[in-house]
Amino acid sequence: VELDYCGICPWDVRAFRGLASGIQYPRLLGHEAAGRVTRIGEAVRSVSVGQAVVVNFIVQCGTCPACRRGLMNVCQRPTYGRGGFAEAVTVPETNVFPFNPKTSPQAAAFTEPLSCVLRGERMLDIQPGETALVIGAGPIGLMHIQVARLFGARVLAADLRPERLEMARQMGAEVVINPGEQSLKDAVLAATDGWGADAAAVTVGSARLVEETLPTLARGGRMNIFAGIYPKEPVSLDPNLIHYRELRVLGSSDSTPADFRQALALIDQGQAQVLPLISHLLPLERLTEGMEIVKAAQGLKVMIDLHA
């Protein structure tokens, strides 16, 4: 696959800095990529040369207990292909997903992160008319807002940056909250007539935000810890609050092939607005600069143009 674009994920930055667990070096990073098929093996039947595709760089074994239970996203014996910060990669047929040639390859490159968002939001089991709270209005949070709305939720979004809160409004958040200016819990209760959020996605890797989000939940509420916390921090949650309100605390990690296909369909059909999330488009030789931009949380999505 000759690659056109590859987005930079915060995980790439952690791995680049040597902070991601389970990584063997040297390692070519990048896993949010789109391109075109240039060569195929003799046994390949599902794709053809010239076809526009997105790539899933994690190859699940398909035979471990997790895979056999349908939890391919947490495969116990995954292998990692060569990353997307490259001009071309070789991947198994099962790990490429064709997309509509009318779809921008920049938009298609959002398939992997959107597939993870879809999985997290699906685990929250949002019902039409419920209130969903999204903590963090970076690129991932902005996709959570859109998916929660697609599931029929009224969305509240919280972030410390006014420009990100404005983007959250543009993506469909009905209420935006700056926790630096007001109590998160009080703001959520005020926006829900004292009921609280039926579902919440914590898209920022912060123990404090996990702790502060739990009390915003309504009875029967669900919280998805979407982001890993690095360096690791202990989290203190009130077990009585979880017990008496029948709360559910959930984690989600990566995505399954089914999530991948659904995310790509949302992009192909224009139901997920991802192009407005690109704030920086850089050539490959400025990859290190792009990593620093993501590390500093400047702008939104930093994407590498592999032909610039």
Task: Please place each PLM-identified region on the residue numbering.
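Glycine-rich beta-strand-centered segment in the early N-terminal region that forms part
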Residues: 1-6, 19-65, 100-103
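Glycine-centered, small-residue-biased loops immediately flanking beta-strands
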Residues: 130, 221-222, 300
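C-terminal hydrophobic helical "lid"/dimerization subdomain
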Residues: 211-215, 257-308
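Residues in the short beta-alpha loop(s) of Rossmann-like NAD(P)-binding domains
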Residues: 19, 161, 229, 255
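Mid-domain Rossmann-like dinucleotide-binding core that forms the NAD(H)/NADP(H) cofactor-binding site
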Residues: 103-182
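NAD(P)H dinucleotide-binding glycine-rich loop of Rossmann-like/cofactor-binding domains
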Residues: 59-135
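Glycine-rich cofactor phosphate-binding loops and adjacent beta1-alpha1 units
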Residues: 124, 166, 171-247
